[in-house]
Amino acid sequence: MVKSDNITWHQSQVSKAERQALNHHKSVVLWFTGLSGSGKSTIANAVEKALFDQQVGSYVLDGDNMRFGLNKNLGFSAEDREENIRRIGEVAKLFVDAGVITLTAFISPYRADRDKVRANLEVDEFIEVFVDTPLEVCEQRDVKQLYAKARRGEITGFTGIDAPYEAPIDPEITIDTSKQPLTASVQQVLNYLAEHHYVSLVTANEN
């Protein structure tokens, strides 16, 4: 691929701070990482709904959804996984610049890839949420039957079976969905956002 050097970044006349002021909340990336079936997407979508109910601008970037469009040309090799996360990191950065709280739900198995996304954002704009649900619990859920296929050898390079998952060393938030209900997990994330002054919230949505 030939890369062009004849490009220039064009600054907007509206700053990120001005967008945040208009929205009455800070923008940040909530990066949900964990094994398939750990509960990343479920929690991320529930948090988004809770934020929406309190008039907080937010959006979920889901791992499966992104592979329908932007990342449809990527597979699951180490190189493709790295590019997958790089692209999502760049999209998430644009969402943050737009003043939106951005929730990403990706296995993102490699620590270095997640760290690159963090480094590409401001210090307080990346919150790593480790959904630390045990492998056996994830396998018991296995709604998509992916673990079963991986165990039978029908899928190769599957994270947690024959491909590694590098757990975060010092995540901002750790959640084990095998030990608490969804409402508690959502409240845990909302509490973090409120306590660190990203948003002003009343309570989590328990519907």
Curated annotation (Swiss-Prot):
The keyword Transferase is assigned to this record: yes
Binding site residues for ATP: G34, L35, S36, G37, S38, G39, K40, S41
Record keywords, A-Z: ATP-binding, Kinase, Nucleotide-binding, Phosphoprotein, Transferase
Active site: residue positions: S108 (phosphoserine intermediate)
SUPFAM superfamilies: P-loop containing nucleoside triphosphate hydrolases
One GO MF term: adenylylsulfate kinase activity
Xref: CDD domains: APSK
Family: Belongs to the APS kinase family.
The protein's name: Adenylyl-sulfate kinase
Record organism: Lactiplantibacillus plantarum (strain ATCC BAA-793 / NCIMB 8826 / WCFS1)
Encoding gene (name): cysC
